[in-house]
């Protein structure tokens, strides 16, 4: 019997694929890959939903995750990806948008919601920022530092270990070559960067195809 699994990707503009006019971001690359495998394969299908919203923090995630999961729930199983932190850790008007402890609590709450629909849950690391925007107030009025990225990624790693979740380490994949993998704004990947993210993620979705 044909099996249909849903992959739900929650996140911000990096999940959505902003700044990639070529591929449309890493999830669109994965979507094309999954479609190709379906057409070549045994009838089972993995359907991917890009649920990224630009500028979203974990506060926004908590408002919508119960409804989104309810609306997209496959009887054959779901895979849930949570990709947050780049907006949470930003400092705006002298205040951190979502402080580390609150970030940890929000991700934990989101994971508890996700658990009602899936045992296949992945936390996605925050990417490093370009040196040119590290500690700099940009046009949006936000200031981000690579120091904070390390702190928030550690929270994600610890939660993944504590709750037996997957952890996708895009941070390490980007670190050495970040200046050529990030777009001109120093925060979002360019098409090369999104391609690199897809390369890291394909082996993960491969087991569900």
Spell out what each predicted region is.
Residues 2, 43-44, 60-209:
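Alpha-helical cap/lid subdomain in secreted, periplasmic
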Residues 1-54, 59-60, 66-76, 80, ...:
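Serine-esterase "nucleophile elbow" of acetyl-processing enzymes
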């Amino acid at each position: 019997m044909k099996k249909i699994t849903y992959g739900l990707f929650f996140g911000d503009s990096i999940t959505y694929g902003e700044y990639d006019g070529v591929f449309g971001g890493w999830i669109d690359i994965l979507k094309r890959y999954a479609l190709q495998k379906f057409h070549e394969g045994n009838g089972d299908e993995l359907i991917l939903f890009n649920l990224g919203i630009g500028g979203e923090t974990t506060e926004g995630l908590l408002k919508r995750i119960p409804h989104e999961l309810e609306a997209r729930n496959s009887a054959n199983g779901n895979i849930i990806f949570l990709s947050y932190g780049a907006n949470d850790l930003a400092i705006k008007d002298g205040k951190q948008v979502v402080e580390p402890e609150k970030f940890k609590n929000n991700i934990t709450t989101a994971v508890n919601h996700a658990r009602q629909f899936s045992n296949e849950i992945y936390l996605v690391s925050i990417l490093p920022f370009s040196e040119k925007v590290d500690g700099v107030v940009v046009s949006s009025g936000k200031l981000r530092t690579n120091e904070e990225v390390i702190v928030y990624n550690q929270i994600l790693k610890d939660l993944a270990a504590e709750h037996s979740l997957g952890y996708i380490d895009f941070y390490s994949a980007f670190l050495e070559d970040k200046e050529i993998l990030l777009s001109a704004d120093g925060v979002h990947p360019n098409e090369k960067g999104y391609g690199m993210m897809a390369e890291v993620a394909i082996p993960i979705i491969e087991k569900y195809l």
